[in-house]
Amino acid sequence: MPRKMFSCDFETTTKLDDCRVWAYGYMEIGNLDNYKIGNSLDEFMQWVMEIQADLYFHNLKFDGAFIVNWLEHHGFKWSNEGLPNTYNTIISKMGQWYMIDICFGYKGKRKLHTVIYDSLKKLPFPVKKIAKDFQLPLLKGDIDYHAERPVGHEITPEEYEYIKNDIEIIARALDIQFKQGLDRMTAGSDSLKGFKDILSTKKFNKVFPKLSLPMDKEIRRAYRGGFTWLNDKYKEKEIGEGMVFDVNSLYPSQMYSRPLPYGAPIVFQGKYEKDEQYPLYIQRIRFEFELKEGYIPTIQIKKNPFFKGNEYLKNSGAEPVELYLTNVDLELIQEHYEMYNVEYIDGFKFREKTGLFKEFIDKWTYVKTHEKGAKKQLAKLMFDSLYGKFASNPDVTGKVPYLKEDGSLGFRVGDEEYKDPVYTPMGVFITAWARFTTITAAQACYDRIIYCDTDSIHLTGTEVPEIIKDIVDPKKLGYWAHESTFKRAKYLRQKTYIQDIYAKEVDGKLIECSPDEATTTKFSVKCAGMTDTIKKKVTFDNFRVGFSSTGKPKPVQVNGGVVLVDSVFTIK
């Protein structure tokens, strides 16, 4: 008999000296009439022991702290051996919570346990967005989180409705996922499983063989993220009119149309020599460099005390640098930089194939373009979650919770643990091609480029640039969508900028439009780490380095669980 599954949620107090759950709710996924809302954590945990089901909380990092704190205070201890009256967790080194598995004992050989998962890992959006995107017949409401609610507080009708809506939105969304066969712990795992189902596991293992951990570690040194760069010319200055374009599904579009690696790599010494059987390669290279006049810098060196990890470099400084580069990245560097004292050390070369992901992407593109609501959103999720799984870090050493003397949770690093890599070369080349796409477009607009962010280019002026004029479309895979046109803007640093975007009013809402159609502007604030509450305080006058405001909730572990304490956010 399949295990029952429930969507769950806690509402908690906001005081450091009185941290507790004042309301809980659970609803069975696939049977929405089976739900309960109550006001006692003890009562909820009693149900957890009896139900032996799979539970989903949206943001387990928060709610899970209350559960683990309760378990520790009630005689349960952490163990990964499945012993009675113990619990196991999957919490990453970075503090991401994936699972809590509570073992109550055994009936014969059958383990009596309840497993708690994070629905945020399967649906990585706020509840409000899920309700809207999935076109569910519910809306996430609002309550006063800071109201006084003493122990035994009687839940008001408004609070009851709020909690019920929250658990029902997630229950409905997960039910749709499960009925589509998306039953893994994360969206990325669902996506990888979907790809294997199309290719077949046997063929997958042949095309993408398991590499040794030492080889994976070396190849991983060529793995880099998106290209995010602000042109110094426009830094901290108010700019006039401009445009933003972004690539439709940047990473899937590279997977669809670019030559990508497969099979076991061949190690080579020295400089790569042309090999038609193995045309893709990663080159380990030591060199000095100087940016050419009129070119965008593309070299970023992380985990090096001599360089800022987020800075794109104009020169190599006093010493040569050593980098692992795909042939895609190396080609860009050779175009953008003068290279000196070059030493080609060694590398890996790969077979190539275009279209490995064609069937998978075609399948989900069809769903995305022909369906609405939930199925469309699931298609987008499947679409965007696959590339990252290939480069999953095999080091899965996690954190282990324990109870500190003050009754709060602490975390220590667990024993070293590794899993097999998936196929890191694929992630390395997909991201390299993505950077190539963005950088080559930006470089062709050198006299206009303000800013790049992974899949987007921000330009001065209101003319569509020549390099993309024939590939502008709001939906086509790999084409550039015209995101917006702004009247004025100010950029301070990567992922920190404001814009007055041309807009018009339609049915009481401001819709972005061309300058010719505009009747007003829409103020947009993009700032990593800044909450919506603080964004409401931002203006063109006060938006600068040093801007500071309260309104950023900071989680603090205390006796009982977690309290979100108001803290100060500063643009540095």
From Swiss-Prot:
Keywords: DNA replication, DNA-binding, DNA-directed DNA polymerase, Early protein, Exonuclease, Hydrolase, Magnesium, Metal-binding, Nuclease, Nucleotide-binding, Nucleotidyltransferase, Transferase, Viral DNA replication. The keyword Ribonucleoprotein does not apply. Residues 1-222 are annotated as: 3'-5' exonuclease and strand displacement activities. The keyword Calcium does not apply. Residues 223-226 are annotated as: DNA-binding. The record marks K526 as: Stabilizes the primer-terminus at the polymerization active site and contributes to the coordination between the exonuclease and polymerazation activities. Mg(2+) 1 binds at D142, D166. It holds the Pfam family DNA_pol_B_2. The record marks D9, E11, F62, S119, L120 as: Essential for 3'-5' exonucleolysis. Its cofactor is Mg(2+). The record marks S119 as: Critical for 3'-5' exonucleolysis. The record marks Y251, K380, Y387 as: Probably involved in nucleotide binding selection. The record marks S249, G388, T431, R435, K495, Y497 as: Probably involved in binding template-primer structures. InterPro entries: DNA-dir_DNA_pol_B, DNA-dir_DNA_pol_B_CS, DNA-dir_DNA_pol_B_mt/vir, DNA-dir_DNA_polB_phi29_vir, DNA/RNA_pol_sf, DNA_pol_palm_dom_sf, RNaseH-like_sf, RNaseH_sf. GO terms for biological process: DNA replication; viral DNA genome replication. Its EC number is 2.7.7.7, 3.1.11.-. Polymerase responsible for protein-primed viral DNA replication by strand displacement with high processivity and fidelity. Interacts with the primer terminal protein; this interaction allows the initiation of TP-primed DNA replication at both viral DNA ends. Interacts with DNA. Belongs to the DNA polymerase type-B family. This is DNA polymerase. The gene is 2.
